[in-house]
From Swiss-Prot:
It comes from Human cytomegalovirus (strain Merlin) (HHV-5). The keyword Transmembrane applies. It comes from the Viruses. GO terms for cellular component: host cell membrane; membrane. The chain crosses the membrane at residues 29-49, 64-84, 96-116, 123-143, 153-173, 176-196, 218-238. This is Transmembrane protein US19. It is a multi-pass membrane protein. Belongs to the cytomegalovirus US12 family. Keywords: Host membrane, Late protein, Membrane, Transmembrane, Transmembrane helix. It is found in: Host membrane.
Length: 240
């Protein structure tokens, strides 16, 4: 049947699918870069840490001092203020510094996990959760120049993010005792907003809230959700 169809029509029909494939491959490469840079920055920071500080962390990790948990709030807030005045990924001519800025909050969270309980298991669950959430964040940034196309093409990662947020929300609701009341409430509120946002993307193909840029809004949700996820992972992986 192929010889009956004109070649130009065949190419025109195939090109949109190739463009979509190229977009998702590009997003996958950026996600892989982000995860690799995150783990590398965390491990490098741990190895370069002065011995007295490392001994102090190892000595205090059983007590789980609150100061270590609160460290994961510092860099995300700083990056957020920087990105509030800066361009998004799709408009930034030099994308490497901005991508590294996206990695910093996750690198600090990884480092917090290492400081509290150094173990390779910290990377496994966090990387799996990161893959689902970061696809939404980076996909929206990459396709932010065309909001309509962005929302349509983000259907699959939005479903993955919705499943991830639903599981986290159910875990939070069933938790016997909040690990930290303020963080527990913030994470639960963020998950609720994430659920509303993902349902809006999937059902209505409209963004929520409309006044926020897609990349900035998803970055805020991403950072807040990551903070809660890492703390939950720490409790789940090393609970007695």
């Amino acid at each position: 049947m192929l010889h009956v169809v004109p070649l130009e029509w065949t190419v025109e029909e195939v090109v949109p699918y190739l463009e979509r494939l190229a977009v998702w491959l590009r997003a996958s490469v950026l996600v892989a870069f982000q995860l690799t840079a995150t783990v590398a920055l965390s491990v490098l920071s741990w190895w370069l840490m002065p011995p007295p500080v490392a001994e102090l962390c190892e000595r205090g990790r059983d007590d789980d001092p609150p100061s270590l948990s609160h460290l994961s709030l510092v860099v995300p807030v700083g990056c957020l203020f920087l990105l509030l005045r800066g361009p998004s990924i799709d408009r930034c001519p030099r994308k490497l510094p901005l991508l590294l800025a996206y990695c910093l909050p996750h690198a600090l969270a990884f480092l917090t996990l290492l400081m509290c309980q150094p173990s390779p298991q910290a990377f496994v669950g966090a990387a799996l959760l990161a893959l689902a959430v970061d696809l939404s964040c980076l996909g929206a940034s990459l396709l932010g120049c065309d909001p309509g196309a962005s929302l349509r093409r983000l259907w699959l990662p939005s479903v993955l993010s919705l499943l991830c947020a639903t599981a986290l929300g159910l875990w939070l609701l069933r938790a016997a005792a909040p690990f930290f009341l303020g963080l527990h409430a913030t994470t639960l509120l963020t998950v609720t907003l994430m659920l509303i946002h993902d349902l809006s993307l999937i059902t209505c193909q409209s963004s929520f809230p409309e006044s926020f840029q897609p990349s900035l809004r998803l970055y805020v949700e991403n950072v807040a959700l990551f903070i809660g996820m890492y703390h939950l992972l720490r409790l789940w992986l090393w609970s007695p």
